[in-house]
């Protein structure tokens, strides 16, 4: 799994507060977990662990980390929770005076969530929006229609100035949320048009027959993503499969 510079784990708390929320503890890497604990501090408390989605580079250490700090893990998917509290669109998490609003942003995965921190005008996007480059729509769990809707929702929040910055799951902080979301929306539409163009020579029946062929998505990747490092073609193929499913729905 590609993680750019590694997984960003976010430790959120109000200034002067002891109690914090930890978002996406990440993989069970000793140095990574030690860095999180150093930020929490020896006199700090963890009120909850929140997960943006289930991919292991965000979630694998969550339960063990939470048990060590005596708190729960809240996630959309029950399989990744620790304790009885779930997490879903519209929920508000409050810890130590900090308010976090949950936004459902499916698409990268079916369980993807983003977390709005009103006090900072920032949104934690997990893998829905990255700090560098664009993300993969992880078909079949991820779905392009849902992803486009999620981008539109985030874009609306940026347009109304509810969010100014994006704190992503990988890569650097984005100071200008609106510009990046503009790019993400236009990029997805451009790629979709490129896939559509690659298929326009096929009739509907021929398309449906060839969609089942395992070589078609890779053939499209080689045309549409010819400007992308072949190392990334595996991830690109997942997005192409999502685009094909979107086009023939």
Positions of predicted regions on the chain:
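Divalent metal-coordination and catalytic microenvironments
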Residues: 12, 24, 53, 87, ...
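Divalent-metal (often Zn2+) His-rich catalytic cores of metallo-beta-lactamase-fold enzymes
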Residues: 145-204, 208-211
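Active-site metal-binding motif and surrounding structural segment of the metallo-beta-lactamase
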Residues: 29-74
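Active-site environment of divalent metal-dependent phosphoester hydrolases
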Residues: 29-30, 54-60, 80-81, 110-112, ...
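C-terminal regulatory/interaction regions
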Residues: 199-249
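Core dinuclear metal-dependent hydrolase active-site scaffold
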Residues: 11, 90-118, 122
């Amino acid at each position: 799994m590609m993680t750019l510079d590694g997984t960003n784990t976010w430790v959120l708390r109000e200034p002067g507060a002891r109690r914090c929320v930890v978002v996406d503890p990440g993989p069970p890497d000793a140095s990574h977990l030690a860095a999180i604990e150093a930020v929490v501090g020896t006199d700090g408390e963890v009120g909850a662990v929140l997960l943006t989605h289930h991919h292991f580079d965000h979630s694998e250490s969550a339960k063990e980390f939470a048990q060590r700090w005596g708190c729960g893990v809240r996630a959309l998917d029950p399989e990744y929770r620790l304790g009885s509290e779930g997490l879903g669109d519209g929920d508000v998490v409050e810890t130590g005076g900090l308010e976090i609003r949950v936004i459902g942003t499916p698409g990268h995965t079916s369980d993807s969530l983003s977390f709005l921190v009103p006090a900072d005008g920032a949104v934690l996007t997990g893998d829905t929006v990255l700090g560098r480059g664009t993300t993969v729509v992880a078909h079949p769990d991820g779905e392009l229609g849902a992803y486009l809707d999620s981008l539109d929702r985030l874009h609306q929040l940026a347009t109304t100035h509810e969010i100014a910055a994006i704190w992503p799951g990988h890569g650097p902080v984005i100071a200008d949320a609106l510009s990046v979301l503009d790019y993400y929306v236009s990029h997805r539409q451009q790629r979709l048009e490129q896939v559509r163009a690659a298929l326009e020579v096929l009739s509907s029946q021929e398309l449906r027959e060839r969609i089942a062929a395992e070589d078609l998505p890779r053939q499209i990747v080689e045309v549409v993503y010819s400007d992308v490092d072949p190392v990334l073609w595996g991830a690109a193929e997942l997005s192409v499969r999502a685009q094909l499913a979107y086009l023939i729905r």
